Amino acid sequence: MKKYITLLIAFSFLTSCSYKEDNTFEQKASNRTTSVIESYKNILEGHDGYWVLSYYPGVTRSFGGFPAAPRSLGGYTFVVKFKDGKVTASSEISNTNAEEESYYTYSITEGPTISFDTYNSILDHFRFVSAVFTNARGGDIEFIFLKEENGVITLRGRTSNNLMTLTKLTGDREALLNKLRENTQALNSKGLNPI
């Protein structure tokens, strides 16, 4: 009799075990990532105007013995426009307000990512290797989307790991770039070098 009771208890334990788990998400991972990329694409390309990219090149550095800042030290402004896989870019680092066009793609790396695939002298300025900058200058051409809040898209550079932002440009592109260059000249004339 003990044998039957033991077998009955053993079988009841086996039948009560279920290897099935409830799904945590309603959609599969591939569908979720596709929808996230699509939402960022709609935000970027849905805006007819320009975006201001606050760009922080360089591997995250420390300053005066203090811990490394997430945005490195100093930043640059790029003005970009996204449409149909093409990006138009201009920046304060250029001597003119001329725009340059190249291509970009969306992909999944550590998260939803935008990559500037083709060479663009403006966007690749900090990626350019020369005799002076043998390891380039820590620039990024791939950015991971972190979040979108109140019209501000927060990105993280895949190379530098620095945080950067994209905000909608409300004024004139050329006026913004000219004002940035004017401020740089004012600092240089005072013996200060803008970071």
List where the protein language model places each region.
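Cys-His-centered catalytic/binding microenvironment captured across papain-like cysteine peptidases
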Residues: 47-59, 122-154
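Contiguous, well-ordered beta-strand patches that form the walls/edges
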Residues: 90-141
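Ser/Thr/Gly/Pro-rich, low-complexity flexible regions
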Residues: 144-148, 155-195
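Short, surface-exposed beta-strand/loop "edge" segments at domain boundaries and coil↔beta transitions
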Residues: 58-64, 97, 122-127, 160-166
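C-terminal motif of bacterial Sec signal peptides marking the signal peptidase cleavage site
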Residues: 13-16
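Sec-dependent signal peptide recognition
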Residues: 2-7
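Acidic/polar, low-complexity intrinsically disordered N-terminal segments immediately downstream
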Residues: 19-103, 107, 111, 173-190
